[in-house]
């Protein structure tokens, strides 16, 4: 009888310890979640205030993006963005968060808005900049602080609008992910009523730093206001950026006389295309 009573007491103590450990673990998890949410709130504030030095503390020295950018390259890009768009404001929303010890994975949806500091010599106004992205951040705890060691951008779209392009509803349709060496189509659409007074181009470039910029070849849109191009992705599995440029003329334009053409609107539209390695693909030479 004494044995069973002792065993019963042992079980009660064991269950109590397990419950305490479970509560302690849950509390620790809750604390880490709060820390990471505050981390991204502080990141959003630093981005919106253009505090580059503060922002650097959020990133590990061995940071690397899925585009192959290191910390130095990343902050050169940030610096250029702040220089050309000093009023930029970011919004970051956490979509999912997972913590495993000293490691965390966070998926965010972010948007940014700004105006260019310089006016266009063509349209005479400052451009409106819009950015939207879905990104997975991989964090590691360094002492008491979290730092970003890697990030993978799943989706990213950017547009820069001058003049009448600010009022035109425009769509750039491209896949977010394709296999290396495969064809994919890109479609650029504007409302049909603008089709006769606009020209557009579509090109694609590999995402590298410093950026490579291929030549724009402008073409007339069809009567529905569409322009389409088919590309083949690179076989090096490097991510690509599709760029559509739009020029909207005023009055009744004569596209055979480009020198006298009066441009009232300009637009640049960028969309990321992530390239997935193809099994057994040969390396491009």
Language-model-detected regions and their locations in the chain:
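Short acidic/polar inter-strand loop motif in beta-rich domains
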Residues: 114-116, 158, 247-261
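Short, low-complexity N-terminal intrinsically disordered segments enriched in polar/charged residues
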Residues: 21-49, 57, 126, 159-160, ...
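Short beta-strand edge/turn micro-motifs at domain boundaries
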Residues: 123-167, 270-277
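Surface-exposed, charged secondary-structure patches
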Residues: 79-129, 136, 232-241, 247-249
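Short beta-strand elements
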Residues: 251-285
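Short, well-ordered alpha-helical segments enriched in acidic and aromatic residues
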Residues: 46-69
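Short edge beta-strand/loop segments characteristic of extracellular beta-sandwich folds
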Residues: 183-193
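Short beta-strand segments of immunoglobulin-like
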Residues: 172-179
């Amino acid at each position: 009888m004494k044995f069973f009573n002792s065993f019963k007491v042992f079980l009660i103590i064991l269950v109590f310890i397990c419950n305490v450990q479970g509560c302690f673990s849950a509390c620790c998890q809750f604390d880490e979640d709060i820390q990471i949410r505050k981390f991204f709130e502080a990141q959003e504030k630093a981005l919106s205030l253009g505090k580059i030095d503060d922002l650097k503390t959020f990133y590990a020295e061995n940071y690397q993006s899925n585009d192959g950018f290191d910390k130095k390259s990343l902050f050169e890009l940030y610096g250029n963005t702040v220089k050309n768009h000093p009023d930029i404001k970011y919004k970051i929303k956490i979509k999912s968060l997972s913590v495993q010890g000293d490691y965390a994975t966070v998926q965010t949806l972010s948007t940014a808005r700004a105006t260019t500091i310089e006016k266009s010599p063509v349209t005479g106004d400052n451009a409106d900049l819009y950015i939207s992205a879905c990104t997975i951040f991989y964090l590691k705890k360094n002492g008491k602080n979290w730092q970003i060691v890697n990030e993978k951008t799943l989706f990213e779209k950017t547009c820069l609008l001058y003049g009448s392009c600010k009022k035109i509803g425009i769509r750039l349709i491209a896949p977010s992910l394709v296999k290396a060496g495969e064809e994919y189509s890109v479609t650029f659409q504007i409302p049909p009523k603008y089709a006769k007074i606009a020209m557009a181009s579509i090109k694609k470039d590999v995402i590298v730093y410093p950026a490579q910029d291929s030549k724009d070849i402008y073409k007339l849109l069809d009567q529905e206001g569409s322009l389409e191009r088919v590309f083949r992705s690179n076989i090096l599995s490097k991510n690509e950026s599709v760029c559509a440029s739009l020029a909207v003329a005023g009055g009744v334009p004569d596209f055979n006389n480009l020198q006298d053409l009066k441009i009232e609107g300009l637009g640049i539209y960028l969309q990321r295309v992530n390239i997935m390695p193809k099994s057994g693909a040969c390396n491009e030479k």
